[in-house]
Amino acid sequence: FTPVHIDCYLDFINYWIRPIVMMQKRFGIKQGSKLSIEFLRYIKRCYKEAYKMYTYSMTTTYRPKCPESRAVTNVQRADPHYLCVPSLHIVVVCLCYSFYRMLFKRESFTQQEREQWNSELYAQAVAIGETVLYVKQHSVNCIPAALYMLTKITPELFTPQMAVNFINDLFKNSTDITDADKKEINSYIQFMFERLLLEGALEDDWRVPVIRWLDSYKPYEPQ
């Protein structure tokens, strides 16, 4: 648990609301609302699909004991470490930046606008994604499961290559993790993502390889 990342973690809701507000200001209430509804329908789809997994398993981790502080207490009371595989935090931030990447192009935003806002949305998506481990205290398995789910249910927005890029950028600028540990973390996430992608390629239900993995997984239990 790394309290310094709490503010970033708590930006999760504001992260996907800010672009909605921007659409309202740019296009007006009528058109801006249509674009916002389009995004919210994707959100709804993601939550419905993730719910199907959570009826099977709510979490794969035990939260380790952390130094007591108000920040720790507030986060752990308000946000239990459930909804783990796939992580909705990862799903939503990746959906957000990929949706608006598509929308900025479709709605004829200028090249400068697209470059600036795509860069900002992506960088914050990566930062919030990292806090899933720093603050939420999921296992690394929640990340590849989320990326895999998105490639299956929103392939028009989120591709396997986008998932690989996201994985490669995780913890790139972190100073509290050794280079060796960064490599090990990212390599494992990449391995799990590719495994799920390959095993799910011929399945009608994207959940099949995730459930297969869950059935064989034994979580680490802190002593």
Where are these regions (language model features)?
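Charged/polar, low-hydrophobicity segments characteristic of intrinsically disordered regions
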Residues: 52-58, 133-147, 183-191
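Alpha-helical transmembrane segments that form the membrane-embedded catalytic/substrate-binding core
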Residues: 92-96, 130-163
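Primarily interfacial, aromatic-capped hydrophobic alpha-helices that serve as membrane anchors
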Residues: 161-223
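Generic low-polarity alpha-helical segments
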Residues: 17, 21, 39, 45-53, ...
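Functional transmembrane or membrane-interface alpha-helices that line membrane-embedded catalytic
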Residues: 109-118, 147-175
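Generic recognition of cysteine residues
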Residues: 8, 46, 66, 84, ...
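Hydrophobic alpha-helical bundle signature of multipass membrane enzymes
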Residues: 1-85, 91-132
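Detector for Asparagine
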Residues: 14, 74, 118, 141, ...
